[in-house]
Swiss-Prot record:
Source organism superkingdom: Bacteria
Species of the source: Prochlorococcus marinus (strain MIT 9515)
Keyword match ATP-binding: yes
Reactions that this protein is recorded to catalyse: L-glutamyl-tRNA(Gln) + L-glutamine + ATP + H2O = L-glutaminyl-tRNA(Gln) + L-glutamate + ADP + phosphate + H(+); L-aspartyl-tRNA(Asn) + L-glutamine + ATP + H2O = L-asparaginyl-tRNA(Asn) + L-glutamate + ADP + phosphate + 2 H(+)
Entry keyword set: ATP-binding, Ligase, Nucleotide-binding, Protein biosynthesis
Protein name per its UniProtKB record: Aspartyl/glutamyl-tRNA(Asn/Gln) amidotransferase subunit B
Length: 490
């Protein structure tokens, strides 16, 4: 009988995270990005006869910390293997990786999924393994973005030998949105740890998607296809959604899905066939004879575990439960470690959490974006933001004045209290100082006063505006409304 259960996608991600060490994984060659091609190459990177690789200790530390943050079981012993393949970007004709004895296995990551027009939900996505390996070089194809159609190709070995960790998820992901959110949470995690900048545009974080479809959760897995060339989280989501639809259409029209590697074409919003997918046997793995096995003591693991920072998922929970933020605001604030730390320090200095969140996510982020800066560039002290928020709460200044002075506070990193005093921006709060100004307004606009008394009470807003204009916004609007209403009705 034909299975008519709804189609279900089965998705797994292989995420390559470039570690931000100063030197490469097995040599002292620099990892600096953006320098002249082939200036960070040495005999070890090229695999010249007589050279021996030596593991960078910081790479091991960063890899173990990432494993622990992703709830993986770190092995007591692991080893490196040679993955053999011939391609111009690999000067040794093999890549040093880990095959059957990886650094860590069997972990998970809890991800918050915000699907369009659906309630946000939490999903625990399993992680199969994490292993260390070296990156390959970079090919630049002249006249095309890929080998096919290019006139010639240039190779830059600056990237070759840079340390990577590859994080392989279990096939627990079911939608493009889940895939995108999972990758995004991986990036948040490595940024919080400080082990990688996670910059997709520079290749510091790259994701390959393995995807198949089947009829319902009880059916066997279908033939999986690998998708490459996605350089943003939205591209991951769109590539998955396109490929799911493509595979379903093929099956429903009696076709066959082949195990292949496909490329995401951002311009055309579709996947293109690149090559048939190799199996692990095609790479002829064997233990690297130049690198001994690695042993990690329990004491060392415990030390690195204790050095882990509070991670984004825990911060989100804390911001909702302890600070009263909405799930959305807690997600925005915790998205970037610099922003989260700035927010917490602002609150620790006496600011209301909700007001601090609003000022940070709206006004400060808006200012930084307009000046093409990121949050890490912010020079403003959280002490001064807390001070400004409290000046508003104490009615020393209005929200409008605060918005006006914020750019200067950010540029100069100075006390808002001092700036308000120097510029005479403090609110006029005593009635005796405001009433003479109101008297002048009544004398200045006799027609409007007469119209108000005839019943056109909406003119009260006009008088409030004029009062604000004369005082440069330094009167509390509620007090202005009260005093004007009393005077006009007398």
């Amino acid at each position: 009988m034909k299975n008519l259960d709804p189609w279900e996608a089965v998705i797994g991600l292989e995420t390559h995270v470039q570690l931000n060490t100063k030197s490469k994984i097995f040599t002292s060659a620099s990892t600096a990005f953006g320098d002249e091609p082939n200036t960070h190459v040495d005999p070890v990177v090229c695999g010249l006869p007589g050279t021996l690789p030596v593991l960078n200790e910081t790479v091991l530390e960063y890899a173990v910390k990432t494993s622990l943050a992703l709830n993986l079981n770190v092995a007591e012993h692991c080893k490196f293997d040679r993955k053999q393949y011939f391609y111009p970007d690999l000067p040794k004709n093999y890549q040093i990786s880990q095959f059957d004895e990886p650094l860590a296995e069997n972990g998970w990551l809890e991800v918050e999924i915000a699907e369009k027009d659906k309630e946000t939900y939490l999903k625990k996505i399993g992680i199969e393994r994490l292993h260390m390996e070296e990156d390959a070089g970079k090919l630049v194809h002249a006249g095309s973005d890929r080998l096919a159609g290019s006139k010639y190709s240039l190779v830059d070995y600056n990237r070759a030998g840079i340390a990577l960790v590859e994080i392989v998820s279990k096939p627990d992901i079911r939608t493009g949105r889940e895939a995108s959110e999972y990758a995004s949470e991986i990036r948040r995690t490595v940024r919080y740890l400080g082990v990688s900048d996670g910059n997709m545009q520079e290749g510091s974080l790259r994701c390959d998607v393995n995807i198949s479809v089947r009829r319902g959760p009880d059916s066997p897995f279908g033939t999986k296809v690998e998708i490459k060339n996605m350089n943003s989280f939205s591209a991951i989501q769109k590539a998955c959604e396109y490929e799911i639809k493509r595979q379903i259409d093929v099956y429903e029209n009696g076709g066959e899905i082949f195990q292949e590697t496909r490329l995401w074409d951002e311009a055309k919003q579709l996947t293109k066939s690149m090559r048939l997918k190799e199996g692990s046997s095609d790479y002829r793995y064997f233990p690297d004879p130049d690198l001994g096995p690695i042993e990690i003591s329990k004491e060392q693991k415990d030390q690195w575990l204790n050095e882990l920072p509070e991670l984004p998922s825990k911060k989100r929970h804390k911001y909702v439960k302890e600070f009263g933020l909405s799930p959305y605001d807690s997600r925005v604030i915790s998205d970037e470690v610099f922003m989260a730390n700035f927010f917490e320090e602002t609150v620790a200095n006496g600011a209301d959490p909700k007001l601090a969140s609003n000022w940070i996510t709206s006004d400060i982020v808006g200012y930084l974006k307009s000046n093409k800066q990121i949050f890490a560039d912010l020079k403003l002290s959280p002490i001064y933001l807390a001070e400004m928020i409290n000046l508003i709460s104490e009615k020393v200044i209005s929200g409008k004045i605060a918005k006006d002075i914020l750019p200067e506070l950010i540029k100069k990193n100075i006390s808002p209290q001092k700036l308000v005093k120097e510029k005479g921006l403090a609110m006029i709060s005593d009635s005796d100082s405001i009433l003479p100004i109101i008297e002048d307004l009544i004398n200045e606009f006799p027609k409007e006063v007469a119209s108000f008394k005839e019943g056109k009470t909406k003119l009260l807003g006009f008088f409030v505006g004029q009062l604000m204009k004369k005082t440069k916004g330094k009167v509390d609007p509620k007090l202005a409304n009260k005093l004007l209403a009393e005077k006009l009705n007398s």
